[in-house]
């Protein structure tokens, strides 16, 4: 039963990060220890986010507290609605 809860949480995270990546939106990533990182999401997988600024940093997701985009991603609104429609089927 617990695995189903995790599976439902992932469709929110992946489309959101993907929209930030595709639209090359600057983000501030706050870590659980209070450190603020800034840059653009270059890539991501299940465990890490590659954040590009002057250099590329590999940030482990378990260390991330909050991601704050400079603006809302446009593509995310469409993908979120599409995901909600699939979930209701």
From Swiss-Prot:
One of its GO terms (molecular function) is RNA binding. Residues 14-73 form the Sm domain. One of its GO terms (cellular component) is cytosol. The keyword Cell division does not apply. GO terms for biological process: regulation of DNA-templated transcription; regulation of RNA stability; regulation of translation, ncRNA-mediated. Keywords: RNA-binding, Stress response. InterPro entries: Hfq, LSM_dom_sf, Sm. Homohexamer. NCBIfam families: Hfq (TIGR02383), PRK00395.1 (NF001602). This is RNA-binding protein Hfq.
């Amino acid at each position: 039963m617990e695995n189903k809860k995790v599976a439902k949480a992932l469709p929110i995270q992946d489309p959101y990060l993907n929209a930030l990546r595709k639209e090359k939106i600057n983000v501030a990533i706050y870590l659980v220890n209070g450190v603020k990182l800034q840059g653009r999401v270059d890539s991501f997988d299940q465990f890490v986010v590659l954040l590009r600024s002057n250099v590329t940093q590999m940030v482990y997701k378990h260390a991330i507290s909050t991601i704050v985009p400079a603006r809302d991603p446009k593509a995310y609104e469409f993908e979120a609605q599409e995901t909600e429609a699939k979930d209701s089927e």
